[in-house]
Amino acid sequence: MVCWQKLQKDVFDEAAMSTQSTSSPSSDAQLMMLADAAWMHLESHSLDKISLTMVADQAGVPMGLAAALGGSVQRLVLCKMAALDRQAVLETYGDIQDAGAVSIREKIVEGLLHRFEIYTPYRGQIAMLNQSVRTHPELALRLADQLESVVRRILVMSGDPAEGMRGQIRVKGVAGVCILVGRVWMKDDSPDLAVTMKALDQRMTQAEEWGHSLRVFGGGRQQREGDADQDADLAGRYGVDND
C-alpha cells in the first residue's frame, strides 16, 4: 500500500510540475528513452526479469513518469520495435523511389530484407522475445499483429493494394514467410545477409506458387473470371509468369 501511494504521489507531483501534455515532444522523447532502455536490457534479460524500475533508472526518467508514459516493459519493447519497423519502411520507401522501374515482387523482397538488416544488430533481443512468447501468449499475438502491420505497409507501398480477403491472405502469407526466413536469419553470419536473401527469395517463390495453385474462393463463373484477371495482373507485377 505504501509503495502504491508513493507511486501515485510521484505521478501527481510530476504532472503538477509540467504544463505540457503527454503527447508533447518532450514526453515523446522521454518515451523513446524508456523504450531504448528496455530494448537494451532485453539483450541480456528475459522479459520477466526486466522491471520498470530498471528501465526508468537506465533512462534517467523518474519512476512515476515512467509508469505514466510506459505502463509496462512489454509496451516499451513493442514501442521500440514499432520505431525500428517505421525506420525500415521509410528507408525502403526512399530506395524504391530511386530504383526506377522494378517489379512489385522485387520491391517487397527489398523491403523485407531491409527489415532483417535493421534488426541484425539486435538478434539477442529477438532471441529473448522468442523465448518469452512461449509463456506470454498475449505477447505472441501483439508481435504477430505488429509483423502483419509492417508487411501490409511494405506491400501497399510496393504496389499491392492488399485489399479484401485475398489481400489479407497475401499479408498473412508474406508474414509467414518472414517468420520462416527469420529462423535462417538468426544463424546468418554473412556480411551481406546472402543466406537470408536466398532463403527469402525461395520462400517468396514458394508462396507465390501456392497462391496461384490454391483457389481459396470459388464463386460463380463471372467471379472466377474476375479473380483470374486480378491474379494474372498481380502475378505479372510480382514478376511471376513474365514471359
Residue ranges and their predicted role:
Residues 4, 18, 187-243:
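C-terminal peripheral helix-coil segments that are non-catalytic and often amphipathic
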Residues 79, 93-128, 135, 145:
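Hydrophobic alpha-helical connector segments
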Residues 81-89, 137:
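Short, basic, alpha-helical segments at the C-terminal edge of helix-turn-helix-like DNA-binding modules
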Residues 97, 101, 156-163:
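Acidic/His metal-coordination segments adjacent to aromatic residues that form catalytic metal sites
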Residues 137-160, 168-179, 198:
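Amphipathic alpha-helical packing segments from all-alpha helical-bundle domains
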Residues 160-165, 184-194:
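Inter-helical turn/loop segments and adjacent helix faces that build the functional surface
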